[in-house]
Amino acid sequence: MADTALVDHSPHHPTKAPRLETASNVILIDNYDSFTWNVYQYLVLEGATVTVIRNDEISLEELIAKKPTQLVVSPGPGHPKSDAGISNAAIQYFAGKIPIFGVCMGQQCIIHSFGGKVDVTGEILHGKTSVLKHDGRGAYEGLPPSVIITRYHSLAGTHSTIPECLEVSSFAQLGEDADKTVIMGVRHKQFAVEGVQFHPESILTEHGQTMFRNFLKLTAGTWEGNGKDVAQGGNFTAAAPNPPKATKKVSILEKIYDHRRAAVAKQKTIPSQRPSDLQAAYELSVAPPQISFPDRLRQSAYPLSLMAEIKRASPSKGLIAEHACAPAQARQYAKAGASVISVLTEPEWFKGSIDDLRAVRASLEGLTNRPAILRKEFIFDEYQILEARLAGADTVLLIVKMLDTELLTRLYLYSQSLGMEPLVEVNTPDEMKIAVDLGAQVIGVNNRDLTSFEVDLGTTSRLMDQVPESTIVCALSGISGPKDVEAYKKDGVKAILVGEALMRAPDTAAFVAELLGGQSKKLPLQSRNSPLVKICGTRTEEGARAAIEAGADLIGIILVEGRKRTVPDDVALQISKVVKSTPRPTPYPTEVPQGDTDATSVDYFDHSATTLRHPTRALLVGVFLNQPLSYVLAQQQKLGLDVVQLHGSEPLEWSRLIPVPVIRKFGLDEFGIARRAYHTLPLLDSGAGGSGELLDQMRVKQILKSDDGLRVILAGGLDPLNVTEIIKQLDESGYKIVGVDVSSGVETNGVQDLDKIRSFVQAAKSAF
């Protein structure tokens, strides 16, 4: 606007209106903005009785107790998600109860509170006047179609994320582009909740007093209660700069798709996340190892394979499990028998991220037959597929409905080039034909129409006759119980995807067993009759032989210079010969796995503990303390060590560089005890070992309870007289002790006592 067009619209020598009894207790939340008091002035001039409260000086309970007649949320600096104090909680509580009006950040809080997103507009405006187009309803009732407004903002609600419960009530042109607009007003379709992005209280805004007056006329929490019909009408759409866009009904899929396109385009410009950055990382072979998605789907302990989904929210159900921990959920699914874990990585509607997938992949490290990992996302670019592979995905989702045939084919072939067979999703006969013609090995039939988000569980069955026999068909969406699954078994469906029902299940394993018609596949607890017993500090052939004949599983020799129990290499070699030539008194039975054991996932420590038990003889353990890796490797070869024990502060990574199982000692407050796929088993001990100092049993309990899959060897002050009692004190966590380690507890005057060795082994074996 030219300067000559600037008009001061502020009240000149104003006369305060009589007290408005229906606005006798208006609460104005101050988001620390100087305009708050201009808003206050306009409200008071209309007869309202107003109390101003800063956003961080009142709790929601205190605000509720004040029983406001109307709520006004002021402008303010920052972002509504992080800088609005009580504003969002107040809007969420009072919506539908009393009228609410938001100004600038106040409107952004409304959008954020109902699930929309506030982001940068590309403009930074400070005292800029614009032409407003509005729908003539709510705050705009009685105003001319075009109004001059004043804007102070760089953030605004984004068109693609405005939730279904809100409608855009006004807009302004974005910059010089007549085809692009910025949201200037929103209104709830049911509740008397309205916001404006501009400043009606500014002296350069036309009809600002009228807007506040219209708001203060409202007394009920809903439009119906106020006798108002605020459904958008023809006047607003006719005033829009691009009428077809304003009137078109946009599906949820289109909204999500548009939002993801914008987000991915922006992400691709960030240094370290550019396509060239991802490709360079991939060429360095840093992507985690992968498994075959189709092959894993063919392995299941149940009649149908389970694709278990990690799903915090959805457009149709809203929040499902907002605070769910993705890696913890993944471990539950794996133990319950899932063949595939689907990780939703879309952040706005489903509340997921690629970081969830990365954490899930890490959490499954070391499982004997881990589930395949699916990136469940709205994929339209090779970039997203490469990103998924680098994060640890074994497969990705390609939705036929949102991709033309050329793009679908390109993405399918690119995914295959990275070793990932995609899951191709269809919903109609035409889409199924496209997937079959593509040659997809795995086709998912979505029972939910992504245009309307309505569920029809019969969709999968109706499309089965189009599918080649060799193709794996998965039923997706809406499955909540055993009855939903029965028809799929009869129709030849090979897998089902379950999300919400699993996320809400109190017992994941029991729910899966009931759903799929099998027995709950809970992992067996370590046998309490066969703990590993390690006799450490062995210095003679006689001591080694006595320990083995008593039933010990592990014979430890100290290979650390300067320790009183250290043995020289020549003695170590003699002990090694004894260990390898002396048979167990009773061989352990060698069990051949039966049935479908390879179709299930066994936690790392349950599996690794079995590698420390030889069926016919004991194993020789060499104990090292902060010595060079090269020395450890040389001694392992020279002495024929079966196991290496690292008893100092050696890096965890060494465990992967040593060619035999590794026991690693941990103090009670040391990080990394439960880290999978490195050390074979952690050993809990105090100090440098051999001190005879008992561990704090309460702290041991806490450690064991912190991780269901943790298994440890217990050391520290054990002897023949206390080992049984100490194990019993651990109560229900005792089964996680898969072995015990003793040194000074079987000595007399610093020398190994053969009778004590025999007594300790007997006591330890009977303690479980």
Curated annotation (Swiss-Prot):
Identify the EC number(s): 4.1.3.27, 4.1.1.48, 5.3.1.24
UniProt-recorded Gene Ontology molecular function terms: anthranilate synthase activity; indole-3-glycerol-phosphate synthase activity; phosphoribosylanthranilate isomerase activity
Kindly state which reaction or reactions the protein catalyses: N-(5-phospho-beta-D-ribosyl)anthranilate = 1-(2-carboxyphenylamino)-1-deoxy-D-ribulose 5-phosphate; 1-(2-carboxyphenylamino)-1-deoxy-D-ribulose 5-phosphate + H(+) = (1S,2R)-1-C-(indol-3-yl)glycerol 3-phosphate + CO2 + H2O; chorismate + L-glutamine = anthranilate + pyruvate + L-glutamate + H(+)
Which amino acids does the record list as binding L-glutamine? Answer: 76-78, 108, 154-155
The pathway to which it is assigned is: Amino-acid biosynthesis; L-tryptophan biosynthesis; L-tryptophan from chorismate: step 1/5; Amino-acid biosynthesis; L-tryptophan biosynthesis; L-tryptophan from chorismate: step 3/5; Amino-acid biosynthesis; L-tryptophan biosynthesis; L-tryptophan from chorismate: step 4/5
Instruction: Give positions of region: Indole-3-glycerol phosphate synthase.
Output: 252-516
GO BP terms? L-tryptophan biosynthetic process
Alphabetized Gene3D superfamilies for the sequence:
3.40.50.880, Aldolase class I (3.20.20.70)
Q: What is this protein called?
A: Multifunctional tryptophan biosynthesis protein
Q: Where is the active site?
A: 104 (nucleophile), 199 (for gatase activity), 201 (for gatase activity)
Per the UniProt record, one Pfam family is IGPS
Described purpose of this protein according to its UniProt entry: Trifunctional enzyme bearing the Gln amidotransferase (GATase) domain of anthranilate synthase, indole-glycerolphosphate synthase, and phosphoribosylanthranilate isomerase activities.
Thylakoid is among the record's keywords: no
Domain annotation Glutamine amidotransferase type-1: ranges:
25-225
